[in-house]
Design a protein with these regions (language model features):
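Conserved, well-structured functional cores that handle cations and Mg-NTP chemistry
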Residues: 1-165
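Short amphipathic alpha-helical "interface-anchor" segments enriched in bulky aromatics
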Residues: 86, 90, 166-197
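Basic, amphipathic alpha-helical segments enriched in Lys/Arg and hydrophobic/aromatic residues
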Residues: 189-227
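Generic amphipathic alpha-helical segments used as scaffolds and interaction surfaces in large
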Residues: 18-22, 170, 196, 200
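Generic recognition of stable, solvent-exposed alpha-helical segments in well-folded globular domains
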Residues: 26, 42, 174, 178, ...
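Short intrinsically disordered coil segments
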Residues: 140-142, 170, 225-226
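Residue-level signal for secondary-structure boundary elements
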Residues: 27-28, 59, 73, 77, ...
Length: 227
């Protein structure tokens, strides 16, 4: 089983390594020109192919991230609640060459309209209790993304249920928006040039793994070692 998927796993590992090293993903060609071509004989097309056609379920990445996050919960906070937050974010893309690109409503669009041309990603975030400055705080780690498709309508029941959610939980919303902003601004989440839905989802989730490792999990592990 390992030998069957070893070449693909190796290629995806190199992609993750390049993202961690450069801390940016302008596009796969950028990763190849500035890092990958210097450490491997694999061709540029190999990395494009791995993203779009690899027989790898990236939900395994989400499971690993969740396991790492759960291990970071201190024993003294083992009885505290854990939260799963689901939200969506928009990514504007020009033209129609990307799979599943469509006109989307975005209340935060800054283009003079409430609509943008692009993709909608639904994300799930795990919020775990940790100690911070001798107080219980929640560390939010995005587990992964899935691209919303037109044939699957968005749930419209959320607004009716909002009044039942305690006000203090709104703080999680800030963590979600901060995560989106950081990934889009500093980790080039919006700059993917892969065209297929599967390829886009694979690359976006690889970026998310690196983001969690470098800015969330590592920082918390260092804090636990210090204190």
């Amino acid at each position: 089983m390992y030998n069957e998927f070893a070449p693909t796993a190796d290629t995806l590992f190199l992609l993750v390594l390049s993202i961690l090293t450069l801390e940016s993903v302008h596009f796969i060609r950028f990763l190849y020109q500035h890092f990958l071509s210097g450490i491997t004989t694999k061709s540029l097309n190999t990395f494009f192919h791995a993203c779009s056609y690899a027989k790898v379920d990236y939900s395994h990445f989400m499971n690993i991230t969740a396991k790492v996050a759960l291990r970071m919960i201190p024993d003294s906070l083992a009885t505290q609640p854990i939260f799963l937050c689901v939200d969506d974010t928009m990514v504007a893309k020009a033209g129609t060459r990307f799979e599943n690109v469509s006109k989307l409503f975005d209340h935060a669009a800054h283009n003079g309209s409430n609509c943008l041309n692009g993709h909608c990603f639904v994300s799930i975030m795990l919020c775990i209790p940790v100690w911070k400055n001798d107080r219980v705080s929640y560390l939010s780690l995005p587990l992964g993304y899935r691209m919303w498709q037109k044939k699957a309508p968005l749930n419209q029941t959320g607004s009716d249920r909002m009044k039942y959610i305690p006000l203090f939980l709104y703080s999680f919303r800030w963590n979600i928006e901060t995560s989106y902003y950081e990934q889009k601004t500093f980790w080039s989440l919006c700059r993917y040039m892969v065209r297929s839905c599967k390829g886009i989802e694979m690359l976006v989730n690889l970026i998310n793994i690196c983001y969690c490792a470098m800015t969330k999990a590592l920082k918390q592990l260092i804090r636990q070692q210090v204190y």
